[in-house]
Amino acid sequence: MAVAVRVIPCLDVDAGRVVKGVNFEGLRDAGDPVELAHRYDNAGADELTFLDVTASSGNRETTFDVVRRTAEEVFIPLCVGGGVRGVAEVDKLLRFGADKAAINTAAVARPDVIDEITRHFGSQVLVLSVDARRTRPGSKPTPSGFEVTTHGGRTGTGIDAIEWAKEAADRGVGEILLNSIDADGTKDGFDLEMIRMVRAAVKVPLIASGGAGEPAHFPPAVAAGADAVLAASIFHWGPNDMMHQVKDAIRNAGFEVR
């Protein structure tokens, strides 16, 4: 792989605090987002991703304030998702200091919004966040066996996850953030089959997310086709040198890291 693999801590932000659960349930407080962002920047993170998991839209302004304060503190790229519905939200995030915006539910509901945002700001600004899971027994099967979910992984759509990733790439998204709902927070490793299938379908950069529990879990995700790897719990509650451990594991497997 010619381009260095990026290692990206993810901060799930709820009402101005970082939280983390298992399969998007049982959220527990992990700290102040600005402090954590500063810590990860100093530790050598290549980027940061903020995902606003706030249930109430009334707390969105809190998130914009967090983005502004974080952007003043850290100097690595910052991607922000959650509640992004169109050009207006992306514009506001960029003005508050974000470098990229991630879109999920709104794009599933109205795919044309991808075209509108990329036409306005360029592909490099837009990340499609795909929360995918294996189809459930009794639910409508999909060709790949994976379906797209919305609303933080709570709502199945019946849309094939691989086909959706391909459509979004064709529409011009700059990157795809592929999160396994089944693996999320379990610390059992990434869903390598899903990564391989999406990699075979798209040429845009692919960020793998969901399931990292130890440094050894990261190299297989890169080998499966991920250009970047994203994790939360392992960084929030792991030792202070976890970023170095993860990068060493990837480097020792023969991949370039920054």
From Swiss-Prot:
Any single GO molecular-function term of the entry would be: lyase activity
Pathway field of the UniProt record reads: Amino-acid biosynthesis; L-histidine biosynthesis; L-histidine from 5-phospho-alpha-D-ribose 1-diphosphate: step 5/9
What does UniProt list as catalytic? 12, 131
**Where in the cell does this protein reside?**
Cytoplasm
Gene Ontology CC: cytoplasm
Q: Which UniProt keywords apply?
A: Amino-acid biosynthesis, Cytoplasm, Histidine biosynthesis, Lyase
GO terms, biological process: L-histidine biosynthetic process
Domain of life (superkingdom): Bacteria
Which stretches are annotated as coiled coil?
Answer: none
Q: Which Pfam families match?
A: His_biosynth
Q: What does this protein do?
A: IGPS catalyzes the conversion of PRFAR and glutamine to IGP, AICAR and glutamate. The HisF subunit catalyzes the cyclization activity that produces IGP and AICAR from PRFAR using the ammonia provided by the HisH subunit.
* NCBIfam families noted in UniProt: hisF
- Protein name, as recorded: Imidazole glycerol phosphate synthase subunit HisF
Species classification: Bacteria, Bacillati, Actinomycetota, Actinomycetes, Micrococcales
Gene name, per UniProt, is hisF
